[in-house]
Amino acid sequence: SSLQEGIKDSAIVTTDVWVSMGDEKESAKRKNEFRNYQVNEKVLDMASSDVIFLHCLPAVRGQEISQNLFDDPRSRVWNQAENRLHAQKGLLLELLK
C-alpha cells in the first residue's frame, strides 16, 4: 500500500514525531525509514477536500511535517492543543474530588 492510497479521501490526517524522547539512538534509522511519509501540503491535497490536519505536539518541522504546515488553513493543531488543555483540566478536577 502506498501513502497516496492511505490518504485518499481521508477526512483527518494526523502524525507524531518520528523520534521520541529516549529513542535518540534510533534517530538516523527512523528518519531514513519515514522520510517518504512526511505530511506536507501535497499530501493533504491527496485527501478529502475538507481534510483537517492534527498533530499531538511537540513537532519537528521539516521532519514529520513540512515547515509551513501549521499555518495551512487545514491545520487544527492549535485547536487540538487547546482542547487537550481543557480536557486535562477536567480530568484533574474529577480526580481531585
Where are these regions (language model features)?
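Rossmann-like adenosine-cofactor binding region
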Residues: 1-68
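C-terminal helix-to-coil terminal segments
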Residues: 71-97
